[in-house]
UniProtKB/Swiss-Prot annotation:
Polar residues biased stretches: 10-20
Biased composition (Basic and acidic residues): 56-72, 385-398
GO biological process: B cell differentiation; regulation of apoptotic process; regulation of B cell differentiation; regulation of B cell proliferation; regulation of lymphocyte differentiation; regulation of transcription by RNA polymerase II; T cell differentiation
Taxonomy, superkingdom: Eukaryota
GO MF annotation: an example: DNA-binding transcription factor activity
Record note on domains: C2H2-type 5 and C2H2-type 6 mediate homodimerization and heterodimerization.
UniProt name for this protein: Zinc finger protein Aiolos
């Protein structure tokens, strides 16, 4: 076996030094190969261990012979199917070479269609480049080569990793040129810039209301379609809605929207029905004839505006300061003007000469015909926009107040009630709307207390602020339309359930 290696080296050296002997070199190679095979077969001893060495030598000679063949051949290969070289690989190498060739042809045909795109062999997705295809295949394999060295989060693309790193560094490269807002993503800055724009490109074709975002418009359209289907008005309702929108001022609409959102955010200021404590006893005789029967008996818009302003002052005017100026507290100069509008119940110490009997003698009871005008003082939100009606209301109110000058509340025993000093909002609130001979609310001490009634819901309130908040929930022109979200109820039961459940919160923008 030792004689084989020198012969192989000698043969290779001779082949390199004599490149001009063409056919003789190939013949010598065949004879030498046959001679070496006979020597290997006839060699005694551990011949199996040296078979690998013989194979390596054959590979080396194959490579050299291929080089010499290329050098000696002057003409290029014309036909690949009929090669002129009488040399071929052994059977074992041909088997593997065929497998590689088949794989190459199949992958080339499937991933390289005629359009130039590459297809995913798993789902068939077409990609424009090889890099895009590799990123897509990571979604099938689950490979995430880009990993954060701080928290260990992995990503399929480098851009996502760079965006994630900004969370750790706190970098906010995208800044608003109008305010101090800064963010990490460009799309977030684009959405923020819409808040500075005055225009509202997304407009509802049903009612004409406009929004800055498409999502807000879609939510509004669902409610608007529901409204049109429930009322069954169709195109007529759309025209009326546009007319109402034109009548209502933009400033007033902004105030109401801010007020509704503020009420929704404050759970403590949500309108609540007065149930009453157990120690209070009620002596109520309700007369259904006091309900409004005509639209001309509804309250004028001046009282409605006052109720809204009182609710705004109670809920907090900081959020509404750019739109509404909170009226200041009444001073000594304003009290005479307010007293001419509303009678102020004075205590015994404030009465002249401390004699309430003189005032009681001056009290003139009103006939039954004046009851509808008293009910007109209820600060409801169902206003009738008519100048003639407003002037008639004012004339009747002045006539009533002149005949009813500052009567203190009295108990059953005929003694006047002692009250604490009037608070700031007590000077502006109207007198109780319910006639004392029809509805009386008596506390545990047997004293008659002031009561405020919502004629739409038939609910009594002992607190004027809660009464004002409740009346602010009624719609302007339809008392059973929610002033927060626009939901229209069929009766007072559905309206009360809607307010109690707070369904309007999900409808707010």
């Amino acid at each position: 076996m030792e004689d084989i290696k020198p012969n192989v080296e000698l043969k290779s050296t001779q082949e390199q030094s004599v490149p001009t002997e063409g056919s003789e070199l190939l013949n010598d190679y065949d004879l030498t190969k046959a001679h070496e095979t006979e020597n290997v077969d006839g060699t005694e001893g551990p011949a199996n261990e040296d078979e690998d060495i013989g194979d390596d030598s054959m590979k080396v000679k194959d490579e050299y012979s291929e080089r010499d063949e290329n050098v000696l051949k002057p003409e290029p290969m014309g036909n690949a199917e009929e090669p002129e070289i009488p040399y071929s690989y052994s059977r074992e190498y041909n088997e593997y070479e065929n497998i590689k060739l088949e794989r190459h042809v199949v992958s080339y045909d499937s991933s390289r269609p005629t359009s130039g795109k590459m297809n995913c062999d798993v789902c068939g997705l077409s990609c424009i480049s090889f890099n895009v295809l590799m990123v897509h295949k990571r979604s099938h394999t689950g490979e995430r080569p880009f990993q954060c060295n701080q928290c260990g989060a992995s990503f399929t693309q480098k851009g996502n990793l760079l965006r994630h790193i900004k969370l750790h560094t706190g970098e906010k490269p995208f800044k608003c040129h109008l305010c101090n807002y800064a963010c990490q993503r460009r799309d977030a800055l684009t959405g923020h810039l819409r808040t500075h724009s005055v225009e509202k490109p997304y407009k509802c074709e049903f009612c004409g209301r406009s929004y800055k975002q498409r999502s807000s418009l879609e939510e509004h359209k669902e409610r608007c379609r529901t409204f049109l289907q429930s009322t069954d008005l169709g195109e007529t309702a759309s025209v009326e809605a546009r007319h109402i929108k034109a009548e209502m001022g933009s400033e007033r609409a902004l105030v109401l929207d801010r007020l509704a959102s503020n009420v929704a955010k404050r759970k403590s200021s949500m309108p609540q029905k007065f149930i009453g404590e157990k120690r209070h006893c009620f002596d109520v005789s309700y007369n259904p004839s006091y309900m409004y029967e005509k639209e001309s008996e509804m309250i004028q818009t001046r009282m409605m505006d006052q109720a809204i302003n009182n609710a705004i002052s109670y809920l907090g005017a900081e959020a509404l300061r750019p739109l509404v100026q909170t009226p200041p507290a009444p001073t000594s100069e304003m009290v005479p003007v307010i007293s001419s509008m509303y009678p102020i119940a004075l205590t015994r110490a404030e009465m002249p000469n401390g004699a309430p009997q003189e005032l009681e003698k001056k009290n003139i009871h009103l006939p039954e015909k004046s009851l509808p005008s008293e009910r007109g003082l209820s600060p409801t939100n169902s206003g009738h926009d008519s100048t003639d009606t407003d002037s008639n209301h004012e004339e009747r109110q002045n006539h009533i107040y002149q005949q009813n000058p500052m009567v203190p509340p009295r108990a059953r025993n005929g003694m006047p009630l002692l009250k604490e000093g009037p608070r700031s909002y007590d000077l502006l609130k109207p007198p109780p709307i319910c006639p004392r001979d029809s509805i009386k609310v008596i506390n545990k001490e047997g004293e008659v207390t002031d009561v405020y009634r919502c004629d739409h819901c038939r609910v009594l309130f002992l607190d004027y602020v809660m009464f004002t908040i409740h009346m602010g929930c009624h719609g302007f022109r339809d008392p059973f339309e929610c002033n927060m979200c626009g939901y229209r109820s069929h009766d007072r039961y559905e309206f009360s359930s809607h307010i109690a459940r707070g369904e309007h919160r999900a409808m707010l923008k």
